Curated annotation (Swiss-Prot):
Designated name of the protein: Chaperonin GroEL 2
One Pfam family in the UniProt entry: Cpn60_TCP1
Primary role: Together with its co-chaperonin GroES, plays an essential role in assisting protein folding. The GroEL-GroES system forms a nano-cage that allows encapsulation of the non-native substrate proteins and provides a physical environment optimized to promote and accelerate protein folding.
Organism: Cereibacter sphaeroides (Rhodobacter sphaeroides)
Keyword Transmembrane helix applies: no
Localization, UniProt: Cytoplasm
One of the GO biological process terms: protein refolding
Key words, A-Z: ATP-binding, Chaperone, Cytoplasm, Isomerase, Nucleotide-binding
Amino acid sequence: MSAKEVRFGTDARGRMLKGINTLADTVKITLGPKGRNVILDTSYGAPRITKDGVTVAREIELSDRFENVGAQMVKEVASRTNEEAGDGTTTATVLAQAIAKEGMKAVAAGMNPMDLKRGIDRAVAIVIAEIRSMSRPVGDSAEIAKVGALSANGEAAIGRQIADAMAKVGTAGVIKVENKGLETETEVVEGMQFDRGYLSPYFITHAQKMVVELDDCAILLHEGKLTSLASMVPLLEAVVQAEKQLLVVAEDVEGEALTTLVVNKLRGGLKVAAAKAPGFGDGRAAMLEDLAVLTGAHLISAELGTKLETVTLDMLGFAKKVVLTKDSTILIDSAGDKAAIASRIGQIRNQIEDTTSAYNKEKLQERLARLAGGVAVIRVGGATEIEVKERRDRVEDTLNATRAAVQEGVVPGGGAALIHAGKALAGLKGDNPDQDAGIKIIRRAIQAPLRQIADNAGIDGSVVAGKVIENDSATFGFDAQLETYGDMLQAGIIDPTKVVRIALEDAASIAGLLITTEVIIAHKPERGERMSQMDEMGGMM
């Protein structure tokens, strides 16, 4: 085991806080309509320009191991918020920094960290309850477009494209974002999404996004388990000869079969991925039949008398693009016969009418939505590759924000909801003075996003926060784009309730862990690493 370095108490927290500030100060300059861009150097290709908080956070790795612990913990806030809400990562980072900074000051002043955390948790619960009570449902497509425009830093065209895509496939429909040429456009294609992802991370083709993307893809559908691919070798060779990529969908793919596919992918002989079939029992068989109709495949099943050794290339289904995450698979522009798909849809509709079971009806309606809904594809354009990448980041953030708004409604935006929800903490007391201090930490910290939005617009954040707090209206706030005060809802400045809620929950959770940390244990650099660090320091002098 390699040697470790240990830091205690104030020294440990001080080093962590320095790392927290380095990461948060880098990320928070992107917040709000007048937030600035960050340029990321890449190991290959052109630099990347972005205003996406989680993208910036993921790039930060500090050389000091103890500072890096703090930075990585706050990076976890951004990642968790992005995973749960899809947006609000910069807000979560700003909140985490504010809570951690105030909390560590209180610990340094001799307060009990555990009581501070109890006070923080109590205050957060009340603020979130208040945010929920302020929330109102999203109305029509125009309001969805407003949410989108705000998330896209005021670019109304992006908001309209998201609203248009949702109008075509439904608010719960599948919407995929891709790169294109000069113009951004939206198209609905035949496709389906199901809730099973890749069976091995070795199939991943885009490490940064942790996804598998297969183009011009052949699809093998198998009803049973695959444990060996010996009988499939001629088929695999035929797929390679046809210059196709391959998706294998089966009840399970394990043992030698999974190993064979992974090795083929890693050696570059065949671009391939495997996923479990969706559903359970009879539902799985029905879903596989839906997939077969949609992709034009023959379902390989002992009941149907088809065996792996007899499968030929023309028995596989096809899709122009397949995208797999760890949790889902999307088939885009699949090659099934339109008449067969329409017939299958009619069959499912008849089953919905005939069934008396509420559970069966729900499952049939899910299948119908998957088959009939299609996939909306937003193709993002721009004059240069750098512009396309930056624009795609914003479109993906916008899509996530609008989905969140549809799920839980919206609240006044621009940091106003947190400020007004914080008024519910007036008069709240803990069980002791240290818990009271934890409550005060949250009262101050929830002002941080509004302050930062104002600072990024070149206006004193303290003055702006003070004016918003003084106003009794729960919808009163600051429009950083126009540098005016007014009703946020009337101005169309709204945030998804889910994004605000999760940003605060995740920030308070991680900051609470940081405040209650007393010891950090880190890997001690080897001699070569120490010499390298000394050389870097020498070069800076």
